[in-house]
Regions:
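Hydrophobic transmembrane alpha-helices and their helix-loop junctions in integral membrane proteins
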Residues: 1-167
């Protein structure tokens, strides 16, 4: 939403709209920064694979939000070239994150499916009262040898998320 509002902020920065755009930009940047840190800390303590990915996504979207706030602040303070670079970096991160995280979510679905399959073959057929959670990462050791394609997809998605191809 903030990215779609950039043309509006461009108009307001030229005196045709709301005063105090710099304050709005700072609020956007700080909101994003605080949210990014909080969501990352929440993701860090999760055991459910999908919750880790979801909170990580929240953290990264907040990081992108911070970049957009900084871009608006730079634009408002007549650093137009730096503002364009910050905006472009935010949009690049958004696209890269969407593609890589989509791959990670699909691979996690494959892992969860395999965990259900493996558990049902090991457990007794009539034992439906156990507390097995196929999404709990504490139960997922040694899956790379059983799911080499999924492990490769996870490795590629993880490398893309951290920017490894660009380093």
């Amino acid at each position: 939403l903030v990215a779609r509002m950039v043309p509006f902020f461009d108009v307001t920065a030229h005196g045709h709209g709301v005063e105090g755009l710099g304050d709005v930009a700072i609020i956007i940047a700080w909101t994003g920064g605080i949210t990014a840190c909080m969501a990352a800390m929440i993701a860090f303590v999760q055991n459910d694979i999908k919750k880790v990915l979801a909170y990580s996504t929240m953290s990264q979207l907040a990081y992108i939000f911070t970049g957009l706030g900084v871009s608006l602040w730079l634009f408002n303070n007549d650093h137009h070239h730096a503002a364009v670079i910050a905006f472009g970096a935010s949009m690049f991160h958004l696209f890269n994150h969407a593609m890589a995280k989509g791959m990670l979510f699909m691979a996690s679905g494959s892992v969860i499916h395999e965990m259900h399959h493996a558990h049902h073959h090991v457990s007794d057929p009539g034992d439906h009262d156990d507390d097995f959670d196929a999404q709990d990462m504490r139960n997922m050791g040694g899956l790379a040898s059983k799911l080499p394609v999924t492990a490769t997809a996870m490795a590629i998605g993880s490398a893309s998320i951290i920017g490894l191809p660009l380093i």
